[in-house]
C-alpha cells in the first residue's frame, strides 16, 4: 500500500498538498510535515490535525538547518551521509515507511529527509510539486490531455 509524506514550508504549499491528497490520494494514508519557515506554523499544524485530512501531521523546526545556519563537524557530516535516519530523529520522529515523498523546496532538511526515507525504502518516489494550484485541477488535466 502506498503512503505519502508531504513537506510544506508555506501556507500555500499546505493548501496545494491538501489538494493533491484530495484529488490523487483520497483513499490512501498520507502524512504532512509543516516546517517553521513560516509565521504561525505551530497553529497551522494544530488546525490541519483537526481536519483529519492527513493521518499524521508533524511540526518541524528545520529553518536554521535548511538555511545552513547550523555548522557540522566532520563526524556529524559523516553521520548525516551514512545514517541520515539517525540525524533526522533530531528534527522529527516518523513512525511509518513511505513510498512517496512530496516536496516543493529542495534544501538541506529536504535532502536529509529524502536520504533517511530512501534508506528505509529504496524505491521511494520523490515528487517535486509546484505552488500552482491549478496544475492539480482535473480541468487542467483534461485540457492538457486534449492537446
Residue ranges and their predicted role:
Residues 5-147:
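Active-site and donor-binding regions of nucleotide-sugar-utilizing enzymes
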Residues 1-3:
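Short, Lys/Arg-enriched, disordered terminal segments
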Amino acid at each position: 500500500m502506498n503512503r505519502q509524506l508531504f513537506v510544506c514550508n508555506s501556507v500555500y504549499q499546505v493548501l496545494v498538498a491538501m489538494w493533491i491528497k484530495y484529488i490523487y490520494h483520497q483513499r490512501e494514508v498520507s502524512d504532512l510535515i509543516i516546517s517553521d519557515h513560516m509565521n504561525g506554523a505551530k497553529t497551522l499544524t494544530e488546525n490541519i490535525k483537526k481536519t483529519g485530512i492527513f493521518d499524521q501531521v508533524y511540526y518541524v523546526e528545520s529553518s536554521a538547518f535548511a538555511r545552513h545556519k547550523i555548522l557540522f563537524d566532520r563526524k556529524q557530516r559523516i553521520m548525516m551521509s551514512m545514517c541520515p535516519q539517525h540525524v533526522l530523529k533530531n528534527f522529527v520522529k516518523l513512525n511509518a515507511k513511505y513510498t512517496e515523498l512530496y516536496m516543493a523546496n529542495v534544501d538541506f532538511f529536504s535532502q536529509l529527509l529524502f536520504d533517511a526515507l530512501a534508506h528505509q525504502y529504496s524505491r521511494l518516489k520523490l515528487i517535486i510539486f509546484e505552488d500552482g494550484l491549478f496544475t492539480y485541477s482535473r480541468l487542467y488535466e483534461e485540457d492538457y490531455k486534449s492537446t
